[in-house]
């Protein structure tokens, strides 16, 4: 089979700081008013009074959605979305395009390595540049799947299970249980600046939902980089009587010694997890060495599917789980091929968590949602990632090359 070459890469964006609030899409923090995802959630900025009530107040939604299209010389188009907005468009159109155009559609690893090497001097350890590279990588996998007529998970070697089971992240674990999810992960609302009073409040929330959900439903806490080791350890012990399954991302990404200490001091049986804001393979290697139980890369932020597969191998070698941060179809196609991913995350994006809404709504068409907390592999049996770009969204292409 003679494979086509990549004719053109195009970068679009929607939402972000210049758009009306609530665009949604891959920048799923960009929601409207009265949404749980922006309601007094503990963050590294919570210690400042003017930024403690809302994550949007300090600009969590300023980037917007990046859309990458890669077109082959036979006319087929692959695409993907992530969080990088207009700045990601500049990086692709003015820098990364030279490593993409003219290559065979199967040259994904070569392109990936060249993008990483060429941006090393300004990419640092992740962030915006890595989000952009991730989006390109995902678009390339989508194109390759469409060209050969296979879903991405089959390009990775095929499914190791018939379905993916999910836990739900949101403010209402009780509703998640009713919908058939295996667990519910809640955001913490208080941090070290609130002292022991904050610990008591978040522990009381866990106690409340343990009472509502019964003894066997999983409950977890997402701390979003807002704590220090001492506070996180005390919170973990305060929640231990309520059978908290894990405590997540308590510390900033690079505090590896802190994660090692937290894992060493955590209550017996309670897992320590992190990884969604790590952005290089090397950082995941170091994170794995801390001994945490679950690594949680975001496939749209960590370097794409190419890096996610490598992270899963690091975790597997150490006997750790890899459970990606919720990233919809882009993680679905990966985790159904990983033997060390027995479950996955679904992020609730409806304002009060009362209905199932596609995570990247409205940017993707045919984006699947779990049914009774599960997605069967047959749902993924479409070429590429199996979704379409919603061109009714206000897409802008600010740069060309």
Curated annotation (Swiss-Prot):
<dbReference type="InterPro" id="IPR018110">
    <property type="entry name" value="Mandel_Rmase/mucon_lact_enz_CS"/>
</dbReference>
<feature type="binding site">
    <location>
        <position position="55"/>
    </location>
    <ligand>
        <name>substrate</name>
    </ligand>
</feature>
<feature type="site" description="Increases basicity of active site His">
    <location>
        <position position="298"/>
    </location>
</feature>
<feature type="binding site">
    <location>
        <position position="29"/>
    </location>
    <ligand>
        <name>substrate</name>
    </ligand>
</feature>
<feature type="binding site">
    <location>
        <position position="222"/>
    </location>
    <ligand>
        <name>Mg(2+)</name>
    </ligand>
</feature>
<dbReference type="InterPro" id="IPR046945">
    <property type="entry name" value="RHMD-like"/>
</dbReference>
<feature type="site" description="Transition state stabilizer">
    <location>
        <position position="345"/>
    </location>
</feature>
<dbReference type="GO" id="GO:0016052">
    <property type="term" value="P:carbohydrate catabolic process"/>
</dbReference>
<feature type="binding site">
    <location>
        <position position="345"/>
    </location>
    <ligand>
        <name>substrate</name>
    </ligand>
</feature>
<comment type="similarity">
    <text>Belongs to the mandelate racemase/muconate lactonizing enzyme family. RhamD subfamily.</text>
</comment>
<protein>
    <recommendedName>
        <fullName>L-rhamnonate dehydratase</fullName>
        <ecNumber>4.2.1.90</ecNumber>
    </recommendedName>
</protein>
<dbReference type="InterPro" id="IPR036849">
    <property type="entry name" value="Enolase-like_C_sf"/>
</dbReference>
<dbReference type="InterPro" id="IPR013342">
    <property type="entry name" value="Mandelate_racemase_C"/>
</dbReference>
<comment type="subunit">
    <text>Homooctamer; tetramer of dimers.</text>
</comment>
<dbReference type="InterPro" id="IPR023444">
    <property type="entry name" value="L-Rhamnon_dehydrat"/>
</dbReference>
<dbReference type="InterPro" id="IPR029065">
    <property type="entry name" value="Enolase_C-like"/>
</dbReference>
<dbReference type="GO" id="GO:0050032">
    <property type="term" value="F:L-rhamnonate dehydratase activity"/>
</dbReference>
<keyword id="KW-0479">Metal-binding</keyword>
<keyword id="KW-0460">Magnesium</keyword>
<dbReference type="InterPro" id="IPR013341">
    <property type="entry name" value="Mandelate_racemase_N_dom"/>
</dbReference>
<dbReference type="GO" id="GO:0009063">
    <property type="term" value="P:amino acid catabolic process"/>
</dbReference>
<feature type="binding site">
    <location>
        <position position="248"/>
    </location>
    <ligand>
        <name>Mg(2+)</name>
    </ligand>
</feature>
<dbReference type="Pfam" id="PF02746">
    <property type="entry name" value="MR_MLE_N"/>
</dbReference>
<keyword id="KW-0456">Lyase</keyword>
<comment type="function">
    <text>Catalyzes the dehydration of L-rhamnonate to 2-keto-3-deoxy-L-rhamnonate (KDR).</text>
</comment>
<dbReference type="GO" id="GO:0000287">
    <property type="term" value="F:magnesium ion binding"/>
</dbReference>
<feature type="active site" description="Proton acceptor">
    <location>
        <position position="325"/>
    </location>
</feature>
<dbReference type="Pfam" id="PF13378">
    <property type="entry name" value="MR_MLE_C"/>
</dbReference>
<feature type="binding site">
    <location>
        <position position="276"/>
    </location>
    <ligand>
        <name>Mg(2+)</name>
    </ligand>
</feature>
<dbReference type="InterPro" id="IPR029017">
    <property type="entry name" value="Enolase-like_N"/>
</dbReference>
């Amino acid at each position: 089979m003679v494979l086509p070459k990549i004719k053109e890469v195009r970068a679009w964006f929607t939402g972000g700081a210049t758009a009306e609030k609530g665009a949604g899409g891959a920048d799923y923090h960009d929601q409207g008013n009265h949404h749980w995802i922006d309601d007094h959630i503990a963050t590294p900025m919570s210690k400042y009074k003017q930024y403690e009530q809302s994550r949007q107040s300090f600009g969590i939604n300023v980037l917007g959605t990046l859309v990458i299209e890669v077109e082959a010389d036979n006319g087929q188009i692959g695409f993907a979305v992530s969080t990088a907005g207009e700045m990601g468009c500049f990086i692709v159109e003015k820098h990364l395009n030279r490593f993409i155009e003219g290559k065979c559609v199967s040259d994904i690893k070569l392109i990936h390595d060249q993008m990483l090497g060429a941006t090393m001097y300004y990419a640092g350890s992740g962030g915006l540049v890595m989000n952009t590279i991730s989006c390109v990588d995902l678009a390339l996998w989508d194109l390759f799947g469409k060209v050969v007529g296979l879903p991405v998970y089959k390009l990775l070697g095929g499914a190791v299970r018939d379905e993916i089971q999910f836990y739900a992240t949101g403010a209402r674990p009780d509703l998640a249980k009713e919908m058939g999810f295996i667990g519910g992960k809640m955001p913490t609302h208080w941090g070290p600046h609130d002292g022991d009073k904050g610990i008591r409040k978040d522990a009381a929330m866990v106690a409340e939902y343990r009472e509502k959900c019964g003894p066997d439903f999983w409950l977890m806490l997402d701390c979003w980089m807002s704590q220090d080791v001492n506070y996180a350890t005390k919170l973990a012990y305060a929640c231990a009587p309520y059978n908290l399954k894990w405590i997540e991302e308590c510390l900033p990404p690079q505090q590896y010694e802190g994660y090692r200490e937290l894992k060493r001091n955590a209550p017996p049986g309670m897992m320590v997890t992190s990884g969604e804001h790590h952005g290089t393979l090397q950082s995941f290697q170091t994170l794995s060495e801390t001994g945490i139980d679950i690594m949680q890369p975001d496939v749209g932020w960590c370097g794409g599917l190419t890096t996610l597969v490598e992270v899963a191998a690091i975790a597997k070698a150490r006997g750790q789980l890899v459970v990606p941060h919720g990233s919809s179809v882009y993680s679905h196609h990966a985790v159904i091929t990983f033997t060390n991913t027995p479950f996955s995350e679904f992020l609730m994006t409806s304002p009060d968590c009362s209905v199932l809404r596609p995570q990247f709504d409205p940017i993707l068409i045919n984006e699947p949602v779990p049914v009774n907390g599960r997605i069967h592999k047959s749902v993924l049996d479409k070429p590429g990632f199996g979704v379409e770009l919603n061109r009714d969204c206000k897409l802008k292409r600010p740069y060309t090359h």
